């Protein structure tokens, strides 16, 4: 974890956006890091509900993303906002472009075992089984 002392020693123009000390434990042994750029056209709903094989860290570089993970209320991420997904069993419900007239974009780095798919779509049956874990209204 980066301490306040370490923050003070950063050169001008360098900023720590997010520190997640609990995230390292979720990275599978033998994982590779994949950096992925996601570009969503205006109003694009993004991928259907899905899972990722491991944790990912990301940053919105352009526009606004409607972002929803299982157990968390949906929220709007704007350019400059960071995000974290634990991966594994957690369902990623929404990653939509919240803007009707501009593209939105994010860059993520995912940690996953070599050869695993970037995402796996969740079946309709499982969505019904896990609906009690979804938080659809802001807290």
Question: What is the meaning of each model-derived region?
Answer:
Residues 23, 27, 41, 66, ...:
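Extracytoplasmic low-complexity repetitive segments enriched in small/polar residues
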Residues 25-32, 37-41, 70-89:
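Short acidic-glycine-tyrosine-enriched beta hairpin
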Residues 30-31, 43-60:
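A short beta-loop-beta micro-motif enriched in histidine and acidic residues
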Residues 53-71, 81-82:
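Glycine- and acidic-residue-biased ligand/ion/polar-headgroup-sensing regions
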